[in-house]
């Protein structure tokens, strides 16, 4: 305390104020956007039976790539390899989708059985040390970060709900949050130190999973890492709003530009409520990227000129692929055309973002 007092005396007023503000920021608990504080819905009926927990995945995270045999663009699916991949990861995706669905059901209906079931699923995987294998390839570490983002994002709704549903489940909550923290630390190791040419949407999704985990576990180090990864991503966006590493995906370049937006918009929204404004990073890179994507959806000609390929629009016809519009339009005052695109596709439900995205980002416009 004595040292702090001397510093305050010695420093000029403005610098001292900045230092003190920084100290307060560092000490403050990490929080989610306001929608995560929503109360649990009024109890409706009784919960059905709890489905069996998917077997905790504790094996090697070495999986077949669905693009196996493709060239460097990694843009052509290998149907046989994809079938193998889906079989290998079934327990993981069943866990992601199932746990998120249980949390959603509970938040809507208030049925204690759904809450107990969701927590039993997550604590079973936590106790087993699922997804923690040190034996992994690129596809395996990708599944680890996707699953962490899905599960921690869904759990966050329980953690911060004003109804305090976890108050009677302290032991299970501790097990689950400790597991998330271990996975978050591993994801940081998995995705740190990559050369710029290797940093693409995978790194952005890793950063989202770490941001979600940071808030759930109140880990400032994880929060800082996620913010730093966002800044790397923002500085990859060129003056026209393109991501050079996603242009490499040729016929899927537009789809992958769109796929890069959900994690980046979520990170920026979470950073904002914790006192870190990322909107102006690289002269408004996130906004340039979003506007470039929406223009491309309306007319893919610019992407075709950039890549020399007709764009595969299959994914872009799926409404939930635009779930990023919710956090984005909470950050920015979206123009009428973008708001209309959002309204036409709502409500958004994305298990990789923790479930009901529209429910937790209901305010239109931004500051």
UniProtKB/Swiss-Prot annotation:
InterPro entries: Alginate_lyase, Alginate_lyase_dom, Chondroitin_lyas
An annotated GO cellular component: periplasmic space
Enzyme Commission identifier(s): 4.2.2.3
Uppermost EC category: lyase
Disruption of the gene: reported phenotype: Deletion of algL is lethal, and microscopic examination of the cells reveals that alginate or a precursor accumulates in the periplasmic space until the cells burst.
Catalytic activity: Eliminative cleavage of alginate to give oligosaccharides with 4-deoxy-alpha-L-erythro-hex-4-enuronosyl groups at their non-reducing ends and beta-D-mannuronate at their reducing end
GO biological process terms held by the UniProt record: alginic acid biosynthetic process; alginic acid catabolic process
Residues reported to bind substrate: 65-66, 138-139, 256
Pfam families: Alginate_lyase
Compartments reported by the entry: Periplasm
Bilayer-spanning residue ranges: none
Function per UniProt: Catalyzes the depolymerization of alginate by cleaving the beta-1,4 glycosidic bond between two adjacent sugar residues via a beta-elimination mechanism. May serve to degrade mislocalized alginate that is trapped in the periplasmic space. Acts preferentially on non-acetylated alginate or its precursor mannuronan. Is able to catalyze cleavage adjacent to either mannuronate or guluronate residues in alginate. Exhaustive digestion of alginate by AlgL generates dimeric and trimeric products.
Protein name: Alginate lyase
Protein's organism: Pseudomonas aeruginosa (strain ATCC 15692 / DSM 22644 / CIP 104116 / JCM 14847 / LMG 12228 / 1C / PRS 101 / PAO1)
